[in-house]
Amino acid sequence: MFFANALKDYIDQLNDLTILLNDNFTVFTFLKSLIIYLFDSIKFVFIYLVSCKWLTDFIELPCTFKSNYTAILEGKSILETNVTPSFFHFLETKPLTSNSFLTGFLNSFFLTLPFSVPHLLSLRAFLINGLPAGISAALGTILGQFTFFICVFFGFEGILIPFLTFEPLNYILGFVIVVNVLYNMAHKPNMEVLNKSQLTILSKFFGLNFVLSWTEQTSLFHYCGNLTFNNVPTLLQSAEEGVSKLNGITTFFLPNFLYLVGILLGSFLWTALLGFLFTIFRNGLSRVLTIPFMFLNDKIHKFIFVLTFTFCLTSIPYYGFDYLVSAPLGFIGQDRALEFFKAKPYYQIATPAKDKVYGEVFLNPIPFDRTGQLELQLSEKPVATFEDYSVDSENAWRNRQKRRPQNTKLQSTQTSRKTFENKERNQDQTFIETFYKSIKITEKSKLSKVEKDIDQIASKLFNPIAYDYYDQGMDHSPYTRKLFREKFYNNPVYKSFVHLDMISFLQGQPESYNLTAIDEAALYRRRFLLENYLASIHDYKDLILKKQTNNSYAENVYNQQFKGSLDLVRHYFSISLTSDINQFDSFGSLLLSDNQKTKKILKFDQPLYKNYLQESNPILHEELDLEVKTNLLQNSVKKKKTELFKKDREVTLTQSKEETEATPFYIGWDGTLRKFLVKKACTPGIPFGNEAFSKNPTPYLPTGLPTYLSFQSWPLNLNENNFKSIFDKGVSIPYTPLSKENALKVAELFELENFKFDHANLSNLLQNQNLPLYNWNILLGNSKDPLLPKNLNAYIDLGNTLPPQFGGFAWPGETIKLPGFLNFLNSNKNDSSF
């Protein structure tokens, strides 16, 4: 009878379903409901038997039999008496997250994303310190989160309440730990790969991440809220159950336990999956870009360091003043005692014109601070919403009166006054015409001195330049002008128009005038060198004005490196190419390299130059008449031809002479006069002081002498009296003889005893000493590639020389051709005056 009534009740339920579902009740729905009903019935019977509830029902049968029997006779459904409404939950559409274990497994994905400081440290330990370090750090993070979830779900008040009571000390503790970690990462980074045997270091990784998972609260999802796959507000809630159902094993402990197990297993699986993906990405990046692992690990370390430092800083403004300061002191949120800390949207400031007149300057309120909008507003004043101040267009319209310029009232009065004047202009027209008529001068008289002074003073006082009218408002804000220029110069449309304008201008001149980028760069380099050369000359002129010291000249100028060679010229008469010239090292490489191209600078100014040297006369202006220029050019050309003809005649007359005038000049320091001199003199025995010509023209040979040499003393002049006497004694003295003081120093240098200064014995004494010789290996035939033939060795041997004075360098003038020079030597071989 019981099963018959149960079957009847089931059919009644199906009839009710057909009425509810109407046309959606299909055969598939019927079979599905039948299978689920049978499965739930078997489960109900099985639980009924296992839980021994049948025993309690059998004991209570005398009490419940009457009510059940009466219900059967009355035709009531047996399901309404003994079966709970949850028995028919199979008819409801269950979501995927109705299973607590699956919900915890899916929600654990958000707990493993590397968007918090503990996860970043775990990722760094895995990628840099190896797999054991990564497992230890990740295990500390996961267990720290899992223990916190256990304390929250099962209500361990002995742990949570003291922990939450000490806020914000727990946050400060986590902040201090993170700062310490950042300091170690910056100064003592651990870049070694760890193994399983280093348990001490691995335990530090585990403990650090475990503590940070409880105390450090920095995460990217602070501003996004808690992300979950179910419809509950936070991750700390497994299902939406009522308070009355939180006291059973099946309704509370079992779902929460399954939820926590899902979180634990999901955290391990998602962490392993993310670590595997990061490893594949790092290896692929290193393989594709051919980057070494050491370099890539260093970049990963720096990136995680910067990201951790950023998270550490962003946590401070997130918690704010209320959480960190006012809440521990006992203040509540929006406490009236702290109103003076709140930002006000209006500030009253005194204008510089009037001290007692105040103007209101509007500032946007703090975002999301709507406490002022909750206050009671007057009926006359409309309530302003947050959007009225956040949107620029609405903000400008709300504050249109406050943005009105200060001279609005003045302009309105001027406008009305002008309108009034226009109405009465006809009445005053005659007066204006007569007033502006020019007055004829009847008498002329000279101005007095007072009147002239008044005119001069008035011209100065009432000059617009004196009041700087033209520059008014331009120089007050140079930063505004800079922004104005950047705004236009960064505009691509403006840049394209300027570019087209300049190109059209440059195309209007001849094509030969357009320099290439390399030509412009070379021209700029020459200008720069010439500028530094002229600056060095000015610096040299100011040397005599420098303050004299008690130190010797050598110690003061040359820093105890006074040697008397070419260093003297570098120190004293150097072309001071400053350190700015170093920029041309890379600049010159651009000119020579093929891979890099020198970019041309777009500008209006172009250098003026001639295609030919005699194209125009530099004295005449370029806009003079062409005929005048051509006549002057022809006259100048004729004059140059006559001068060249005269010079050729003089050259032919001087070809028979033994020696021409001394064309070379010498630059150096004169030790006797203590002056830096530029002199003309010839050096006996050295071919650089001669310039010879041959009557018979000979073919030109490319081999020539060098165009400069370095010398260590000054050469002798031809008209000195003792030149011939000294030269006859066989000593080569190509410079001025030493003074008495310098000769004594030379004697001390060579340890000459009983030395007396005399020009006669000076040569004899110094002739017997082993003095250093001039190094002429480059010119003589001893080297591999001599510049002169071997038959000239006898004419360039200087023999013994006197100890050097102060040196310099010499320039012989034009390059000497060897055939003419050989003829000159053959004709003057035995001449002693040479």
UniProtKB/Swiss-Prot annotation:
Cellular location(s): Plastid, Chloroplast membrane
Region (Disordered): 397-424
GO cellular component term, pick one: chloroplast membrane
Chief place where the protein resides: plastid
Membrane topology: Multi-pass membrane protein
Domain of life: Eukaryota
UniProt feature, compositional bias: Polar residues: 407-417
UniProtKB keywords: Chloroplast, Membrane, Plastid, Transmembrane, Transmembrane helix
Transmembrane regions: 30-50, 101-121, 125-145, 167-187, 261-281, 303-323
Similarity comment: family membership: Belongs to the ycf78 family.
Protein's recorded name: Uncharacterized membrane protein ycf78
Species of origin: Tupiella akineta (Green alga)
